[in-house]
């Protein structure tokens, strides 16, 4: 029987000093035999997805105490990728994932917490906490802050839903007036919550449902809706139950590594492919699997991408559909239900809230259940009032969207595409693979050949795209030395993709990079090229004007030069000595913190995780 971890610091004569300090936090005599639960919050006023979390940690804490536990809250950092976008702030986004994971480990292990509730929401916070949960392997429940309501603008053609990506594209389009840009800006992000489309934050919060570590509705019920409060209340009670099952009944089935098994990672990736989730999820799932010693790799993602169809399309892949619409159609449990009927997921796996995913689907899939509590829950609608307050409205749709032929969520027979929403491409400039969000690629450019336009920083590419005439239809914009090590930090390329759209080139150009893309990116955007240029990847050998062939149906990307020419270029690069595999004439200040990150990070094909073995070299 495993002993409660907390008793290391709460029991025994020699822990009198520690108990004295615990008492100073409010603990009483009767508390020292209870499980100590870490409430891992991520409140900050910098991030709209986290601005409403301030009081939610204490909401969970009160429920933990009602259930017989002792709750202790702490905070992690949280970076807003949208605000950090387009300048050197984006260098810090991906590295913050490791800082978050480490900070959770530090706090939980230093204070011997028995279990934890992870209150996350935005891009790197959910992945960082997920990595920590897999690393620590103590009972854990995830509950996110929830998606924001979609913005709405009234145009001459009628009302249109919008988000921050629409505002960015409009701002770079000379045909859009300053006043219309202001209207878009003021309407794009009306409430607290993670950005309203299927961007990275919402993708990851959906995947925690598929992994079995979060309650149904975690990925889709709006931050503003009163129904979301129930998730926080239930998480507080549930985590105490899980802790008791593990420490008092020796039930290891409640631990993250048992729940988030290899098959669960397959489920999560299958969901991601079926809903056209952010390409960043590939990085984060690989990293979380690595922490839990789960042998889930790019090869598994490639295998799944070849058989999983697209059953749900959400902004930015399609206009006017956002997370509030996915929720109305049954949320993540609705998509998983269709994947189950198609025989594409494993349902014999445990979750934190049900004995198996099969049991969860029987209760929560709106096409199977007639339970009024469930159908009412999925009718939770946007309130339409700008606010930064959680649970501030309780509006409901009159009915559900259960049309699986032409609704937001489709069944297998009526899939948007039989080919999945994400694909892994391989070739002579991406020997370890690269990722494209096929759900956001127009069918007319699934095969694309063009000349490479070389840029060794995102800034240089943006400057060229905005300079009318420098980038032409048919070009392939290639941005290198922006990978995990080369950036460092693997910047998101949201501005280049958005500006291509604003210049009318969204369906006429491709973008290839060893950096990554925002969940808000769409178009023929190929990222995570591995190995990256800074690690000797062949992307560093491409020359201006070289022809690149992209063939998504056949999962291929190819630089049209001979093997002999590739070898000649590699030898010439290696002959440069210390200047080899480095960008030319790029002026970028790299702090010591980022230098330390670059020294330890690995390829995107491995999730850009740290390789501590390098410390022993």
Swiss-Prot record:
Q: Which GO terms describe its molecular function?
A: 2 iron, 2 sulfur cluster binding; dihydroxy-acid dehydratase activity; magnesium ion binding
What this protein needs as a cofactor is:
[2Fe-2S] cluster; Mg(2+)
Q: Name one GO cellular component term.
A: cytosol
Q: In which pathway does it act?
A: Amino-acid biosynthesis; L-isoleucine biosynthesis; L-isoleucine from 2-oxobutanoate: step 3/4; Amino-acid biosynthesis; L-valine biosynthesis; L-valine from pyruvate: step 3/4
Identify the SUPFAM superfamilies for this entry: IlvD/EDD N-terminal domain-like, LeuD/IlvD-like
Q: Which reaction does it catalyse?
A: (2R)-2,3-dihydroxy-3-methylbutanoate = 3-methyl-2-oxobutanoate + H2O; (2R,3R)-2,3-dihydroxy-3-methylpentanoate = (S)-3-methyl-2-oxopentanoate + H2O
Residues the record lists as N6-carboxylysine modifications: 124
Q: Entry's NCBIfam families?
A: ilvD, PRK12448.1
| Role summary | Functions in the biosynthesis of branched-chain amino acids. Catalyzes the dehydration of (2R,3R)-2,3-dihydroxy-3-methylpentanoate (2,3-dihydroxy-3-methylvalerate) into 2-oxo-3-methylpentanoate (2-oxo-3-methylvalerate) and of (2R)-2,3-dihydroxy-3-methylbutanoate (2,3-dihydroxyisovalerate) into 2-oxo-3-methylbutanoate (2-oxoisovalerate), the penultimate precursor to L-isoleucine and L-valine, respectively.
Concerning PANTHER family, the annotation shows: D-XYLONATE DEHYDRATASE, D-XYLONATE DEHYDRATASE YAGF-RELATED
Q: What is this protein called?
A: Dihydroxy-acid dehydratase
Species name for this entry?
Azorhizobium caulinodans (strain ATCC 43989 / DSM 5975 / JCM 20966 / LMG 6465 / NBRC 14845 / NCIMB 13405 / ORS 571)
Q: What is the lineage of its organism?
A: Bacteria, Pseudomonadati, Pseudomonadota, Alphaproteobacteria, Hyphomicrobiales
């Amino acid at each position: 029987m495993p002993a409660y971890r907390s008793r290391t610091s709460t029991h025994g004569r020699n822990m009198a000093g520690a108990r004295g300090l615990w008492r100073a936090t409010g603990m009483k005599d009767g508390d020292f035999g209870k499980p100590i639960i870490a409430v891992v919050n991520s409140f900050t006023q910098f991030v709209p997805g986290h601005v409403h979390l301030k009081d939610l940690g204490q909401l969970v804490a009160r429920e933990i105490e009602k259930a017989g536990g002792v709750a202790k809250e702490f905070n992690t950092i949280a970076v807003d990728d949208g605000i950090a976008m387009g300048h050197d702030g984006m260098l810090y986004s991906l590295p913050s994932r490791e800082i978050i994971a480490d900070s959770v480990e530090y706090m939980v292990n230093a204070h011997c917490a028995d279990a934890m509730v992870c209150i996350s929401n935005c891009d790197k916070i959910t992945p960082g906490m997920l990595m920590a949960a897999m690393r620590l392997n103590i009972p854990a429940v995830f509950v996110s802050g929830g998606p924001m309501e979609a913005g709405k603008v009234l145009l001459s053609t009628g009302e249109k839903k919008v988000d921050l990506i629409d505002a960015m594209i409009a701002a770079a389009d000379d045909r859009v007036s300053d006043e219309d840009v202001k209207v878009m800006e003021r309407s794009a992000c009306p409430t607290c919550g993670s950005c309203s489309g299927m961007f990275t934050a919402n993708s990851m919060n959906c995947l925690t449902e598929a992994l079995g570590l979060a309650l149904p509705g975690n990925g889709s019920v709006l931050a503003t809706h009163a129904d979301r409060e129930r998730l926080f209340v239930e998480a507080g009670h549930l985590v105490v139950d899980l802790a008791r099952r593990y420490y008092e009944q020796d039930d290891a089935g409640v631990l993250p590594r048992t729940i988030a098994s290899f098959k669960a990672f397959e489920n999560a990736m299958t969901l991601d492919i079926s809903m056209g989730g952010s390409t960043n999820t590939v990085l984060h799932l690989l990293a979380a699997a690595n922490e839990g010693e789960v042998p889930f790799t790019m090869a598994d993602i490639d295998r799944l991408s070849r058989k999983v169809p697209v059953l749900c399309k959400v902004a930015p892949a399609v206009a006017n559909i956002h997370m509030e619409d996915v929720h109305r159609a049954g949320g993540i449990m609705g998509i998983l239900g269709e994947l189950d009927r198609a025989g594409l997921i494993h349902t014999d796996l445990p979750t934190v809230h049900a004995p198996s995913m099969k049991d969860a689907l029987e209760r929560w899939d709106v096409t199977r259940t007639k339970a009024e509590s469930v159908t009412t829950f999925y009718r939770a609608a946007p309130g339409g009032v700008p606010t930064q307050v959680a649970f501030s409205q309780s509006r409901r749709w009159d009915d559900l969207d259960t049309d699986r032929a032409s609704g937001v969520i489709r069944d297998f027979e009526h899939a948007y595409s039989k080919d999945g929403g994400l694909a892994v491409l391989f070739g002579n400039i991406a020997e370890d693979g690269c990722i494209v969000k096929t759900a956001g690629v127009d069918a007319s450019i699934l095969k694309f050949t063009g000349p490479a336009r070389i840029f060794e920083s995102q800034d240089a590419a943006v400057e060229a795209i905005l300079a009318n005439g420098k980038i032409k239809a048919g070009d392939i914009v290639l941005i290198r030395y922006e990978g995990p090590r080369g950036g460092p930090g693997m910047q998101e390329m949201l501005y280049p993709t958005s500006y291509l759209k604003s210049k009318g080139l969204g369906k006429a150009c491709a973008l290839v990079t060893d950096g990554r893309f925002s969940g808000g990116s769409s178009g023929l955007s190929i990222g995570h090229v591995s190995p990256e240029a800074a690690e000797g990847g062949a992307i560093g050998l491409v020359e201006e004007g070289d022809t690149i062939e992209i063939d998504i149906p056949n999962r291929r990307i190819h630089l049209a030069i001979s093997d002999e020419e590739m070898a000649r270029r590699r030898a010439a690069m290696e002959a440069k000595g210390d200047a080899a595999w480095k960008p030319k004439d790029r002026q970028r200040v790299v702090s010591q913190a980022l230098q330390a990150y670059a020294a330890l990070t690995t390829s995107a094909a491995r999730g850009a995780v740290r390789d501590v073995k390098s410390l022993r070299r």
